[in-house]
Amino acid sequence: MEPAAAGPGPLIVNNKQPQPPPPPPPATAQPPPGAPRAAGGLLPGGKAREFNRNQRKDSEGYSESPDLEFEYADTDKWAAELAELYSYTEGPEFLMNRKCFEEDFRIHVSDKKWTELDTNQHRTHAMRLLDGLEVTAREKRLKVARAILYVAQGTFGECSSEAEVQFWMRYNIFLLLEVGTFNALVELLNMEIDNSAACSSAVRKPAISLADSTDLRVLLNIMYLIVETVHQDCDGDKAEWRTMRQTFRAELGSPLYNNEPFAIMLFGMVTKFCSGHAPHFPMKKVLLLLWKTVLCTLGGFEELQSMKAEKRTLLGLPPLPEDSIKVIRNMRAASPPASASDLIEQQQKRGRREHKALIKQDNLDAFNERDPYKADDSREEEEENDDDSSLEGEAFPLERDEVMPPPLQHPQTDRLTCPKGLPWAPKVREKDIEMFLESSRSKFIGYTLGSDTNTVVGLPRPIHESIKTLKQHKYTSIAEVQAQMEEEYLRSPLSGGEEEVEQVPAETLYQGLLPSLPQYMIALLKILLAAAPTSKAKTDSINILADVLPEEMPTTVLQSMKLGVDVNRHKEVIVKAISAVLLLLLKHFKLNHIYQFEYMAQHLVFANCIPLILKFFNQNIMSYITAKNSISVLDYPHCVVNELPELTAESLEAGDNNQFCWRNLFSCINLLRILNKLTKWKHSRTMMLVVFKSAPILKRALKVKQAMMQLYVLKLLKVQTKYLGRQWRKSNMKTMSAIYQKVRHRLNDDWAYGNDLDARPWDFQAEECALRANIERFNARRYDRTHSNPDFLPVDNCLQSVLGQRVDLPEDFQMNYDLWLEREVFSKPISWEELLQ
């Protein structure tokens, strides 16, 4: 499902006869024109099949899969984040950077190494390099930029270990920041973005390669290293470094660059790339820099949690019932392995299943579990009878958590022991209490009292107890308070006073994004679609491989295998960056103001984000999470410190020893969280999950034995269980039990039954249009000053102020100014005494 290319328009689905979207092409991704053939494309048939098999191991025997020791965080380890910046094709450029630095360095310092100089000498040379960026000759400027990049990379030629490289890298980057390198690079980047000659040359080229983006890649590399390193807080940092970090974060989020935050410039690069005007832009580096810029300026998930607690205190709301980050970290997803008797029983059931007669059932009860998006892996047998009995012989990861045997011994950590009982405190909204009271009053008394939640006269004692329990667990969200305040501002614009909008980084960023936010969302989703492993390349799809393909295509089997790994890794990093950017923006906007979040979320929905994420998960997700698309000996900084061994097919296939790929699991969790954000409390969007038949796709994702990922999958299943029919619920009791155990409860939510279906007709357009009207009113009131009602605008009564205003006069008036003076001023008598009184 491709993101909408034109302006936003609601996705209209017929309520009576839901039609799934047309199935996209098979999930075997083909590179765009000019791209290399797939990994192993030059291999003999058997070898290619074996290589591909090692790349994506089949996860059908998932009962043997171990628990994934994965801890979710804002980013991966620093070394891993640095390594993912460079593609393996860029390897030879490390030595080129070193050569450019040493040629210039030897002119000024002949007898010492960089690591032997003192701080003043370092600063002097850094400023000298900075001056070199101002030359007009492109080649000279590029050489100086490469020399600066070598300094930012830790002057690795003088280091003997990876730790030493990282030490000097951190020192050098704070030095470069101190002399003002980042601002100079922003100006150069702006110049390169507007370089029309490079853009028109790239548009005309049939196949774009690494060479077309050299200048941009060097600049983006330095900027990424600065942002990523300064953002990392280390215990041994000097006091001045900590001060510089705070100043840098503030500047990065302020509208200092063309009167807009730096992130807006990067968003502009993304849209320019997607429009086809700049196909040479190195999109992976742009997206990584965009992600780290947003993370650095707005803050990560733990910072967000503390900001949320502060805001609740400010609004006079009670504290959060628990710290969700800690609760999720303490959740377990392990399960006992399948016993031999279970396996025999499963085989017998499969044998019996073949002789079952087909039973005609109601549409949703039968709920055909075949996907609208058919992937290549062999899942027909699994989907023919999608009930939990088909998983009996497998180690279903959510079954009987409390009787789980102890996991393998690991080093002691500071994790809290998980308390007995349910992990989450239940929540109740004010609206839920009102609905409960209304139904109770109409049932027992025969009349209603509107939104009165205190009067319980005439209601039986058990109802009193129920209301007391509901009120004990009442939870008022920040979003509800913000929506109520917005209603007040609109209801009484004069008496309500002027709203004080705090210029926090999220507010500044939203103001910058607001004019073109729909285009930014469409562009990000287009790139996500092109990078998804289930996508098939089309002639009109964008080429995201411009900064990974070499000038000359591989000629040997080994080069082809290396490039295949590089291309897959490149796509995975892009998915990781986009998913992280979208999630961070959604969470920060939701905290800053609910209608900022709703504006972004609605444009994601209009651009088909929901089916796109479902399409992403319609693959062998266990294979995606355990994919080994990395060559550890070629990762930075390992490749610049150690002598490179001779690459062989075996060393390429070996990958690392991790049981999962951190970036892929991180991406999957982010995408599930985005899907949760988009559908939460939105009936029409929940029905989209049902219409797109997401249940079987999500159920397969439960095979990944990681607690956080399972939690968000179960949340998505919970919101749609009431619409899947009784038969589905009956045959998926283990999933229902898992939802009960893992997901937060709403005390009067009838999620497991579906008794209120008749009262909730599905009208996508009406719901989205009502929400859109609220969003537009909010944006117009707060940001659209030009179209405000003139009666409500303040009036300037000061004579000096009015006379001091500059008025633009039309040209014809200026030419005939003498005539106007004669007719309107000199020819009319003026009573100066009256005028001056």
Swiss-Prot record:
Region (Required for STRIPAK core complex formation): 796-837
Modified residues (N-acetylmethionine): 1
GO function terms (MF aspect): protein kinase binding; protein-macromolecule adaptor activity; small GTPase binding
SMART domains assigned: DUF3402, N1221
GO cellular component terms attached to this protein's record: cytosol; FAR/SIN/STRIPAK complex; nucleus
One GO term (biological process): negative regulation of hippo signaling
Keyword Cytoplasm found: yes
Acidic residues bias: start-end ranges: 378-391
Chief location: cytoplasm
Keywords: Acetylation, Cytoplasm, Phosphoprotein
Keyword Transit peptide part of the UniProt annotation: no
Biased composition (Pro residues): 18-35
Family: Belongs to the STRIP family.
Subunit structure: Part of the core of STRIPAK complexes composed of PP2A catalytic and scaffolding subunits, the striatins (PP2A regulatory subunits), the striatin-associated proteins MOB4, STRIP1 and STRIP2, PDCD10 and members of the STE20 kinases, such as STK24 and STK26. The STRIPAK complex can be extended by adapter proteins such as SLMAP:SIKE1, CTTNBP2 or CTTNBP2NL. Interacts with CDC42BPB. Interacts with CTTNBP2NL.
Function: Plays a role in the regulation of cell morphology and cytoskeletal organization. Required in the cortical actin filament dynamics and cell shape. Part of the striatin-interacting phosphatase and kinase (STRIPAK) complexes. STRIPAK complexes have critical roles in protein (de)phosphorylation and are regulators of multiple signaling pathways including Hippo, MAPK, nuclear receptor and cytoskeleton remodeling. Different types of STRIPAK complexes are involved in a variety of biological processes such as cell growth, differentiation, apoptosis, metabolism and immune regulation.
Protein name: Striatin-interacting protein 1
